[in-house]
Amino acid sequence: MANITMKELLEAGVHFGHQTKRWNPKMKEYIFGERNGIYIIDLQKTLKMFKEASKFVSDVAAEGKLVLFVGTKRQAQDAIAEEAKRCGMFYINQRWLGGLLTNWVTVQKSVKRLKELDEMATDGRYELLPKKEVIKLERERKHLQANLAGIKNLNRLPDCLFVIDSNKEQIAVKEARKLGIPVVAVVDTNCDPSEVDYVIPGNDDALRAIRLFASKIADSVAEGSQLADKSMIESTNVSNAAEVIPQSYIGDDEEHGLAQPTEEAAPVEEEINMEEVLGKGVRKQPVSENENVEAAAAEQK
């Protein structure tokens, strides 16, 4: 599993939630307190729950299964695409097409059309067509490319979703839940954690926070995939797997975007005083006069 530290979380601003007026009462257990009208996320819980999520995605990849990275908000688009490619998985970073999972057969027809247009653009067939027709086909190709490029080689439903902002990607989350596909998600203070299988409480808006989580999850996937490859080789060529000594890892050349396995996250041996870390001005829960009323109303629904 990929390791993550309290220092990394703090430097990335993972502890900053939304304004106190924009919150979901179901996130109460993950909130440490409030400062200047902003909820502060309990990073002790973020560390613990990230470790669980990291282990899960690593195990999924180790079984040769597929992870789909999802993040269509502007600040998440680049990180989602880069990290998914780096660990050899798939992504959606522009727009989630309704029915992408639940209407998989139809989506695959669109993917097939994209591949056909890509071939036409490279094999010389465009040169045989009228200019207006080429412009029309190119417009169609670019539209499909924008929405489906990250799943062009995904030949079956994914086995797990990694999501940035479960509110923004609620359609993807609902489709996954309907099909029984586990969801790992970065969940901010305005989200509903009950819709997610593996909750990672944290800031889902800050670019540094998004990049941190996406890169660490990609590391875990890469490590799991490496174990899957190693297991396949051992079962095929070695009679006694216990005698096999690992010789190499997936590349460590960051310049070329290759994933590097990391050590398993060590358990937190001592409690970190959040008040000391965050300084003065943090009020613990409840932080608003209407909070208990809101929470009670939410529980009755």
Curated annotation (Swiss-Prot):
Transmembrane spans: none
Region Disordered, annotated ranges: 282-301
GO biological process: translation
Entries under PROSITE patterns matching the protein: RIBOSOMAL_S2_1, RIBOSOMAL_S2_2
Keywords: Ribonucleoprotein, Ribosomal protein
GO cellular component, one term: cytosolic small ribosomal subunit
Any one GO molecular function term: structural constituent of ribosome
SUPFAM superfamilies: Ribosomal protein S2
Classification via Pfam families: Ribosomal_S2 (PF00318)
Bias (Low complexity) ranges: 289-301
Gene3D superfamilies in UniProt: Glucose-6-phosphate isomerase like protein, domain 1, Helix hairpin bin
Protein family membership: Belongs to the universal ribosomal protein uS2 family.
Name of the protein this chain belongs to: Small ribosomal subunit protein uS2
